[in-house]
Amino acid sequence: MRLFLSLPVLVVVLSIVLEGPAPAQGAPEVSNPFDGLEELGKTLEDNTREFINRITQSELPAKMWDWFSETFRKVKEKLKIDS
């Protein structure tokens, strides 16, 4: 009697084990292969916008413009004197 009951149980257990992973445990379904790339692009866009806003709101552009203007003025004066 024990053998009679244990064989079907063994068959059921083996069929469950050998069936493989359930669909939810399998590989994730990829609806669009470019979703990850799109997310990366949006992140890059946000970071770039934040960087540009930070630069435009800082004093760095004004300081650079003043430095270039002063350097250009000095070079111009030096060339005027030498000529």
UniProtKB/Swiss-Prot annotation:
Q: Which GO MF terms are attached to this record?
A: fatty acid binding; phospholipase inhibitor activity
* Localization terms from the record: Secreted
User: Where in the sequence is the signal peptide annotated?
Assistant: 1-26
Q: Which domain of life is it from?
A: Eukaryota
Q: Per the record's keyword annotation, is rRNA-binding included, yes or no?
A: no
One Pfam entry name? ApoC-I
One BP term from GO: negative regulation of cholesterol transport
Its GO CC terms are:
high-density lipoprotein particle; very-low-density lipoprotein particle
Q: Does the keyword Transport apply?
A: yes
Keywords, ordered alphabetically? Lipid transport, Secreted, Signal, Transport
Query: Family, per the entry?
Result: Belongs to the apolipoprotein C1 family.
Q: What is this protein called?
A: Apolipoprotein C-I, acidic form
